[in-house]
Amino acid sequence: MKMFKSLSLIPRIVSPFQKCYSTDLISLVGVPRVKITKGQNRYLLVNIHTHGFTKYGRVIVRGADVDNHLAIFDSILEELEPEGICAKILGGGRILNEPDNKKIKIYGTSRTFGGADHTRTRNILQAWTTYKDFKITVKQ
């Protein structure tokens, strides 16, 4: 009888772990690490996490041809909030993406969010399959 009582506690013990490591982690991993457009763009380096469920986040790069970095942040929130994912801006700058020449130049800073770690941005881009053959230069 004691064994059955002990076994009845298993779902209560397993449920939080199952919720933490399945649904939320899958939604976090399902977010593409890089989304930048062709040409000269502003970009943001963003740490994303599932609030309350994941201990560590994932760093993503988002860039677009917009007037300011705040517009990029608004589009990030529109993309991630329905999934329950929180975003923290690590900084921003500019990216010159020339896919025809296979070159990317990362430089500058964001007036709104401050400067991003361009070396970290370069490493993320090089790890992404689309940009692994590109020559990526960083100017601080």
Curated annotation (Swiss-Prot):
Family of the protein in this entry: Belongs to the janus family.
SUPFAM superfamilies: PHP14-like
Gene Ontology molecular functions: protein histidine phosphatase activity
Any single Gene Ontology cellular-component annotation: cytosol
Keywords: Differentiation, Sexual differentiation
Active site: 69 (proton acceptor)
Protein residues bound to substrate: 42, 110-112
Function of the molecule: JanA and janB regulate somatic sex differentiation.
Residues spanning the membrane: none
Record's protein name: Sex-regulated protein janus-B
InterPro entries xrefs: Janus, Janus_sf
Tree of life domain: Eukaryota
One Pfam family from the record: Ocnus
BP GO annotations: cell differentiation; sex differentiation
